A protein has these predicted regions:
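Alpha-helical substrate-recognition element adjacent to the catalytic core
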Residues: 1-73, 145-154
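Short, well-structured alpha-helical segments in soluble
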Residues: 77-86
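C-terminal accessory extensions appended to soluble enzyme cores
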Residues: 120-154
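Short coil-to-beta transitions that initiate beta-strands within beta-rich domains
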Residues: 72-77, 127-130
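Short, hinge-like loop/turn segments at secondary-structure boundaries
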Residues: 53-56, 109-111, 128-130
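Surface-exposed charge patches
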Residues: 49, 81, 100
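Structural motif
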Residues: 29, 82-83, 102
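Acidic, Mg2+-coordinating phosphoryl-transfer loop and its flanking beta/alpha structural elements
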Residues: 86-126
Length: 154
C-alpha cells in the first residue's frame, strides 16, 4: 500500500491543540487509501494522547521529535526518514517550505491551508520559493522525458 506522510500540526491540530475539522476529514479519506504516517513536533506519548482524545485512529506510525538531530530541521529529517523506509506517495503539510522540500525530493505534495491555523513559531517564506521549486521540477521532468538538445537527433 502506498504511504502518505501527514503533518499533525497545521493539518489536524491548531497551535493551541484544537482539532481542525476539515483536516480530520481529509485525514480520514487519505487513511482509507494510503498507509498513513503522521509527523509531529511533540513526543510520541503526547501525540498519541492527542490522537486518542480526538478519536483519530488508523495511522500506521508516528514520526515524532525523536527523529531529530541537532542542527537539522525536524520536518526535513522526518521526510528523509520516511523516504529511507520506503516510497512516499504523498506529503500533506500546512507549510509551503516543507512542501517545496518534499517536491525537491520527488514527493507529490498537498499544501493544506485552513484559516483556523496560523503558524507563529517561525515566519513562512514567500510563495516565490514554492513557485521556483515547482518550475525547477517541471523543467527536470521535461528534460527527463525529452532529453536535452545535445542528445536529440533530428
Amino acid at each position: 500500500m502506498a504511504t502518505a506522510l501527514v503533518s499533525l500540526e497545521g493539518v489536524l491540530m491548531t497551535e493551541v491543540g484544537d482539532p481542525i475539522p476539515d483536516g480530520v476529514r481529509l485525514y480520514r479519506v487519505i487513511a482509507e487509501h494510503y498507509r498513513t504516517v503522521l509527523t509531529s513536533d511533540m513526543s510520541v506519548q503526547k501525540t498519541d494522547h492527542w490522537l486518542r482524545s480526538n478519536m483519530i485512529f488508523g495511522y500506521a506510525d508516528i514520526y515524532d521529535d525523536r527523529y531529530f538531530f541537532e542542527g537539522q530541521d525536524l520536518r526535513h529529517r522526518q521526510i528523509d526518514y520516511a523516504m529511507a523506509q520506503g516510497k512516499v506517495e504523498l506529503f500533506i503539510d500546512a507549510d509551503a517550505d516543507y512542501c517545496a522540500y518534499a517536491l525537491s525530493k520527488g514527493i507529490p505534495s498537498l499544501m493544506f491551508a485552513n484559516p483556523k491555523f496560523v503558524r507563529s513559531k517561525r515566519p513562512v517564506k514567500p510563495w516565490e520559493d514554492l513557485r521556483s521549486e515547482v518550475e525547477r521540477q517541471r523543467l527536470a521532468l521535461l528534460d527527463a522525458h525529452l532529453g536535452s538538445s545535445t542528445k536529440r537527433f533530428e
